[in-house]
């Protein structure tokens, strides 16, 4: 048995392939897997930190074994947790903000809180030019999106996030 077969599920990693490769087109994203009931809080916190600091979707994987498990766990002191630094828009961007602009140094998009005057924008599902926000089908623009994905490996290695497995994105 397995997921969606009508049979009881067993411990397996079939969902991992779905998470890594089940998206439209070429759109890599960070995937974090909790390793134990005790690890769930840290994994969820780190997933939120990555999502908010890099404005990217992050998938957090758990399973029934972890969900039904239990272990002693001490609630962490919130002041001991690493700070989350969202990459917010600047006052200089007011009335000139587009959600496709990236910080030239970090390659992270700026985050405008919805409803702020001077930062209104419209999002769509088509690929946009990284500077203007106009619809783009140019190969160079598309290539630029893949160059940005390198931050995942750099971020994980700089922030002591354990990486299990190969650095090769084609290897599971």
Regions found by a protein language model. Give the residues of each.
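Flexible glycine/proline-rich, aromatic-decorated loop/lid segments
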Residues: 1-26
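Short beta-strand segments
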Residues: 1, 33, 59-63
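Short, well-ordered, mixed-charge alpha-helical segments that flank or form enzyme active sites
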Residues: 2-4, 39-40, 67-70
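A broadly conserved detector of short glycine/acidic/proline-rich loop/turn motifs that flank catalytic sites
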Residues: 23, 35-36, 64-65
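Short coil/turn connectors at secondary-structure junctions
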Residues: 13-14, 25-29, 53-57, 171
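Flexible, low-complexity linker and terminal segments
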Residues: 43, 48-172
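Hydrophobic alpha-helical scaffolding
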Residues: 2-9, 30-37, 109, 113, ...
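Active-site/ligand-binding-proximal alpha/beta "capping" segment
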Residues: 26-51
């Amino acid at each position: 048995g397995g997921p969606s077969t009508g049979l009881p599920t067993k411990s397996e990693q079939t969902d991992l392939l779905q998470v890594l490769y089940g998206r439209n087109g070429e759109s890599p994203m960070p995937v974090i897997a909790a390793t134990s009931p005790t690890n769930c809080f840290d994994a969820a916190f780190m997933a939120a930190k990555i999502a908010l600091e890099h404005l990217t979707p992050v998938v957090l994987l758990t399973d029934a074994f972890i969900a039904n498990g239990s272990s002693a766990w001490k609630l962490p002191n919130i002041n001991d947790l690493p700070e989350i630094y969202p990459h917010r828009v600047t006052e200089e961007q007011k009335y000139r903000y587009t959600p496709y602009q990236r910080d030239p140094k970090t390659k992270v998009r700026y985050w405008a809180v919805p409803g702020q005057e001077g930062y209104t924008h419209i999002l769509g599902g088509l690929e946009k030019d990284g500077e203007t926000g106009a619809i783009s089908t140019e190969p160079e623009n598309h290539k630029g999106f893949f160059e940005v994905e390198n931050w995942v490996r750099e971020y994980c290695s700089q922030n002591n996030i354990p990486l299990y497995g190969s650095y090769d994105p084609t290897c599971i």
